[in-house]
Amino acid sequence: MLRHAFALEVKEGRTSEFRGNLGKIWPELTAFLDAKKMVNFSMWNVERIVFGYYETEDDFVFTDADKETVKAWEGSYGDAYTWVSTPFEEMRLMYHDFGIVRESKELIRHRVFITKLVPGAEDEYKARHDVLVEARGGKVTEGPDSNFSIWNAGGYIFGYNEIDTTMERDRTEEDRQGDIAWET
């Protein structure tokens, strides 16, 4: 399975227009996703920043015809948004811990985040997270976090995490202090 992400910024005062236009193309979009076997497609927003995520089979590529279809949809949007990521190009993967991907999403809760990085901090952020990936030594994480990825484009990081709710536990003060130490 391949994982993909994209990001947009809705122009000031145009959120209703953006959502309305998305609703107009939704039946066509979902048919396209089904035909291309693009699954687990989701979009979230924090204020005007929109983060999208989807999964495909390993041999997935956008054909020229696919790109033209997407461009036609964009035409129906007018200029309600601008791209944060580059269309049809992979966003930079900053971190991954794919763990065990649950086929059933019924007991999954999602954690999604969008954060503006300090200018020029992308490489340091990636290096810190590469240490975590290396420390796992290829070991599969059983949970509760699974299918966790952090992407980068336009000075932002975008996180997607599926959390198995049957494996969650109450966080301790030690957990919180560890988070603070990691983040600062």
Predicted regions and their residues:
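Short glycine-/aliphatic-rich beta-strand segments at the starts of folded cytosolic domains
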Residues: 1-18, 108-123
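Short, structured motif recognition centered on aromatic/hydrophobic residues
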Residues: 5, 26, 112-114, 157-160
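Short amphipathic alpha-helical segments
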Residues: 14-37, 121-145
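Tryptophan-centric aromatic hotspots in well-structured domains and transmembrane helices
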Residues: 22, 73, 133, 148, ...
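Short, glycine- and small/hydrophobic-rich beta-strand elements in well-ordered beta-sheets
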Residues: 27-51, 55-56, 137-166
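An amphipathic, aromatic/His-enriched active-site/gating alpha helix that lines ligand/cofactor pockets
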Residues: 32-39, 56-89, 143, 163-184
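Glycine-rich beta-strand-turn "strand-cap" elements at beta-sheet edges
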Residues: 41-48, 70-108, 151-153, 183-184
